[in-house]
């Protein structure tokens, strides 16, 4: 937590200064309680962008390959949860569930990887929807639009109203999540 706060105070302002991200829909971010933020994935900088919008610590779900070597300690210090994408990683979901049970925040990119296709979004994997169905945490969709450039069209993140998860199965939650993000990107012309 200390390391995360240190970065928030010193690194995040530098990020904001360089990229001047535009943030829309802040009113859709719950002030307290367990939250799952889920949206499209364009760049390694997406995690930094999402973290700059929130004061509370975000525990990101990230591919386990990032935890090899010296970088592993860095990601662990940030509270990042490693995910083995080659299998259905029950231990990663269990660790995320523990974060949510304590009222924490999970950040996840359900596409599972950077979207380098011409599609608006790649098909979402079911992990975010499963976590939401199981935990009943607020599931807040977001869409990242634009580019991380110092000059020109700036990157933008837009948060949408939380998806209702009570009394719903993971499939219907996942369908609504993917459609919300897709529509947000299509309306913003990505």
Predicted regions and their residues:
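Non-catalytic C-terminal accessory region of glycerolipid acyltransferases
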Residues: 93-190
